[in-house]
UniProtKB/Swiss-Prot annotation:
InterPro entries: BRCT_dom, BRCT_dom_sf, DisA/LigA_HHH, DNA_ligase, DNA_ligase_CS, DNAligase_adenylation, DNAligase_N, Hlx-hairpin-Hlx_DNA-bd_motif. DNA ligase that catalyzes the formation of phosphodiester linkages between 5'-phosphoryl and 3'-hydroxyl groups in double-stranded DNA using NAD as a coenzyme and as the energy source for the reaction. It is essential for DNA replication and repair of damaged DNA. The active site is at 124 (n6-amp-lysine intermediate). The lineage of its organism: Bacteria, Pseudomonadati, Pseudomonadota, Gammaproteobacteria, Thiotrichales. Residues 602-678 form the BRCT domain. It comes from Francisella tularensis subsp. holarctica (strain OSU18). One of its GO terms (biological process) is DNA repair. This is DNA ligase.
């Protein structure tokens, strides 16, 4: 589905099962977009659409709390960790800020605090978030945000950045200090880097953020050292007990500057909301003239004690907010409209544009979402149009400018046949989405289905990337999933740019994937609308592929995360003889699906049946590890303290949760006592 399709649904008239299915689908979609943005640095939707979809999910869950998805983007930050670097757990979770999009919403945030307070104001840098750890004042290691719980250790690359202190400029450093900031590439350096890349026939970067993120993730730090990256610090994370915390956020930033860190020279201390508005007005007008890209402004309660009182949500602090700038818009001309085919056959119109610069990037393509969108906006080939590039990702055509329309402008019509395989295109139930009916007979769908099949959350054949899949399909070496497991060394080495070593790596990766879990297999076969969460639920419920194949509609709709839509899709999938043949061929070549093992919770007198909250950081446990351990012995782990909480497990640097637990008289357990109880 596309963002516009999610927006067009009339959720208030849906049956409960359908509503639940769409909430799950939206949560899965946002998780995937988060992974593409934070982990792969390859977003396919705009920041604006992501923010609107996130808010839509929040609203739906607020109205229907019984349908709240488990482990969704509502509870998490960011994306998962790439392979290739050592994974390090954050000593203190790297959270993100809630967003607002207007001065009215910013005013609401200010008024909710219920204090006439000072706000520290700063630009929101558009780069890569980083945590740098110092021991006794000396650089120890650096970690990316990752999924907020753990990230990639990129110390050697970060040490090459000229303005990163390798030793704190103080005679009395704390024993441990984690400094957080944003790694960026300024506009001029970005243009110079792309010019260099183009001259040397290398792939250029789409924008400064991607250039910064891509540089930090390079394995050769010598190359990174040649790139003029910069670090702008915005705060601290973990700190040892000997660190003397300033009384205000503004003083904290001055302290970091005295330690040798670069901070924004556009920081400002607003004493009231009128000054907040003045700062907003000033920065909005100066944005284009800044040396670096910013995508918004950040406002933080200045008083540190008040920050602690206001507290946190699962996603981040309640005492800070990010104001996001509107998307950048320019004019261009539609030269042509082409139709692309996705994994499920969805037909997406794409405008080919007269190249135009938007935010320092040349744009020549823009999504038109669907044919209904084209009709409602009356967009024609030859029209002058407004193009928006929000958050430096895939542009979209916002509207046409009919006052400039030429007499030969062509109306865009949905083709009756697939542009790739010539199969009939159908529209079911008069929805916005049209689909190619070719299925596995359509090369475009085949290619996208196989890319999905080998992806990390499916069969996880990590050496078989998207480009290689395209090569193999084009060469008629693979058409169905089972064909992947029939590939041989000679076939692979016969392809362009496939040497002996890389070919063997692919074969080893394929062999390694031959014992998938049932949940991975269900996700991999690509049943429409089934994501990770519903795959897990189905695997745990049925316990085997045989039982899943025999599932009846009535049984399916009783399962968590499976509504009528998904249930119908599952039944339809197993009624298709080609799907059955594909799965049987797959099993015939020796794939061994691992059925889930149902583990009975061990009984623990202290924790079984208890509601537990975890706060602070721990010397001997990661937060995720401790959560899983407690759940394995029957505890219910929640994110907030209430009268229903039985105990709070408290580590170092515990904040408002500890305070609230003490106020409510909830039992507090320190790490020193935890091991004995476990």
């Amino acid at each position: 589905m596309t963002p516009n399709e999610f927006f067009s649904i009339k959720y208030h008239i849906l049956a409960k099962a359908e509503l639940k299915a769409y909430i799950d689908k939206l949560a899965d979609y946002l998780s995937q977009q988060s992974y593409l943005y934070h982990t792969l640095d390859k977003p396919i939707i705009s920041d604006s659409d992501y923010d609107k979809l996130f808010r839509l999910l929040q609203d739906l869950v607020n109205d229907n709390p019984q349908f709240k998805p488990i482990n969704s983007v509502l509870d998490r930050v960011g994306g998962e960790v790439l392979a290739g670097f050592e994974t390090i757990k954050h000593k203190k979770k790297m959270t993100s800020l809630a967003n607002v999009f207007s001065l009215e919403e910013l005013r609401d945030f200010y008024d909710k605090i219920e204090y006439d307070i000072e706000l520290e104001c700063e630009p929101k840098m558009d780069g890569l978030a980083i945590s740098i750890f110092y021991k006794n004042g000396k650089f120890d290691y650096a970690v990316t945000r990752g999924d907020g719980i753990q990230g990639e250790k990129v110390s050697e690359n970060v040490k090459t950045i000229r303005n990163v202190p390798l030793k704190l400029n103080t005679s009395n450093p704390p024993e441990e200090l984690e400094v957080r900031g944003e790694i960026i590439l300024d506009k001029q350096s970005f243009l110079s880097l792309n010019e260099y890349m183009q001259t040397h026939e290398n792939k250029t970067f789409a924008n400064p953020r991607n250039a910064a993120a891509g540089s930090i993730r390079m394995l050769d730090s010598k190359v990174v050292a040649k790139r003029p990256l910069k670090l702008y610090s915005y705060g601290i994370g973990y700190f040892s007990k000997d660190f003397v915390y300033p009384e205000t956020q503004f003083e904290l930033m001055q302290l970091l500057q005295s330690f040798g860190f670069t901070i924004s020279d556009n920081m400002f201390l607003a004493k009231n909301f009128s000054e907040v508005e003045e700062y907003h007005h000033k920065m909005s007008h100066q944005r284009a003239d800044l040396a670096y890209d910013i995508d918004g402004l950040v406002f933080k309660v200045n008083n540190i004690k008040l920050q602690d009182t206001i507290g946190y949500t699962a996603r981040g602090p309640k005492w800070a907010i990010a104001y996001k700038f509107p998307a950048e818009e320019v004019e261009s001309e539609v030269l042509n409209v082409e139709f692309q085919v996705g994994r499920t056959g969805a037909i997406t119109p794409v405008a080919r544009l007269k190249p135009v610069a938007v935010g320092g990037v040349i744009v020549s393509n823009a999504t038109l979402h669907n044919i209904n969108e084209i009709k409602s906006k009356d967009i024609r080939v030859g029209d002058r149009v407004i193009v928006r590039r929000a958050g430096d990702v895939i542009p979209e055509v916002v509207k046409s400018l009919p006052q400039y329309r030429k007499s030969d402008a062509q109306i865009v019509e949905m083709p009756t046949n697939c542009p790739v395989c010539d199969s009939k295109i159908e529209n079911v139930n008069d929805q916005a989405i049209y689909r190619c009916t070719g299925g596995w007979h359509c090369q475009a769908q085949t290619t996208e289905r196989l890319k999905h099949f080998v992806s990390r959350k499916a069969m996880d054949i990590d050496k078989l990337g998207a480009k290689l899949i395209e090569q193999l399909v084009a060469a008629n070496l693979i058409k169905y999933p089972a064909d992947i497991y029939k590939l041989n060394f000679e076939q692979l080495t016969g392809l362009e740019r496939m040497a002996a070593k890389s070919s063997q790596n692919v074969l080893d990766s394929i062999t390694k994937s031959k014992e998938p879990s049932l949940a991975r297999f269900i996700f991999a076969i690509g049943i429409k609308d089934i994501g990770e969460v519903s795959s897990d639920a189905l695997a745990n419920h049925f316990g085997s592929l045989e039982s899943f194949r025999d599932a009846k509609f009535e049984e399916l709709i009783e399962i968590n995360y499976v509504g009528e839509i998904i249930a119908n899709n599952i039944v339809s999938f197993w009624h298709d003889s080609l799907n059955i043949k594909i799965v049987e061929e797959f099993l015939a070549i020796g794939i061994k699906i691992q059925n889930p093992v149902k583990v009975e919770h061990a009984y623990n007198e202290s924790f079984t049946g208890k509601t537990v909250v975890i706060t602070g950081s721990f010397e001997n446990y990661g937060r995720t590890e401790l959560t899983q351990l407690l759940k394995s012995i029957g505890a219910k782990v929640t994110s907030s303290v209430s009268k229903k909480t039985d105990m709070v497990i408290c580590g170092d640097n515990a904040g408002s949760k500890l305070t609230k637990a003490q106020e409510l008289g909830v039992e507090v357990i320190l790490e020193d006592n935890l091991k004995d109880l476990l």
